[in-house]
């Protein structure tokens, strides 16, 4: 866990541009390290997860860009697009935080078909209507990496179906701020 003294934050605010550039540099280094681990794992699926608001989508997009700059073909999926329609949810799916809200079979099927090099209809979820709002085509490749990001990607209900082919990545802001009282 990173620890920052409150006084250092105050000093950093005197040069906001430098502070932002340093934060970006730290983030880039973490993306670079994650990409290296993913490439060395020889596993074609990245299951990226973290709590709500942790930066999963941003991290997944940055990881995708980084890998593509290395010449790797990447397919990026958001688990949010694989939610079941509200009227088809089982009783266990009490809220959006429940893994039972996810159409796991469709998610796993799309991942598998992308890795087989097939063109796949990827759903997009309409949260206002509470159902799939349509589909967009995505072309897979035999040697591609599929990054699937979402709050439940490391949940055993999902991860156990892809475990042998997946690298798990957990994203969370973990910075402790020290005040004069600490």
Model-derived segments and spans:
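Charged, amphipathic alpha-helical linker segments immediately N-terminal to NTP-binding catalytic cores
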Residues: 1-33
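Hydrophobic anchor at the beta1->P-loop junction of P-loop NTPases
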Residues: 46-48
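Walker A (P-loop) phosphate-binding loop of P-loop NTPases
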Residues: 53
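Conserved lysine of the Walker
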Residues: 56
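Post-Walker A helix-loop "phosphate-sensing" segment adjacent to the P-loop in P-loop NTPases
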Residues: 65-75
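Conserved nucleotide-sensing/catalytic segment adjacent to the nucleotide-binding pocket
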Residues: 75-77, 84-130, 145
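ATP-dependent NMP and nucleoside kinases share a basic, alpha-helical "lid"
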Residues: 142-143, 148-182
């Amino acid at each position: 866990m990173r620890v920052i003294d409150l006084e250092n934050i105050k000093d950093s605010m005197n040069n906001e541009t430098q502070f932002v550039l340093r934060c970006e540099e730290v983030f880039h280094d973490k993306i670079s390290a994650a990409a290296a681990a993913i490439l060395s794992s020889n596993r074609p699926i990245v299951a990226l997860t973290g709590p709500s608001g942790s930066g999963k989508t941003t991290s997944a997009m940055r990881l995708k860009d980084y890998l593509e700059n290395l010449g790797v073909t990447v397919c990026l999926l958001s688990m949010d697009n694989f939610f079941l329609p509200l009227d088809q949810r089982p009783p266990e799916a009490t809220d959006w935080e429940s893994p039972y809200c996810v159409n796991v079979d469709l998610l796993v099927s799309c991942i598998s078909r992308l890795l087989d090099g097939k063109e796949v209809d990827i759903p997009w979820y309409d949260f206002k209507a509470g159902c799939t709002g349509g589909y967009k085509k995505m072309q897979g490749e035999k040697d591609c990496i599929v990054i699937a990001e979402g709050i439940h990607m490391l949940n055993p209900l999902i991860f156990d179906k892809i475990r042998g082919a997946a690298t798990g990545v957990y994203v969370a802001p973990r910075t402790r701020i020290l005040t004069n009282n600490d």
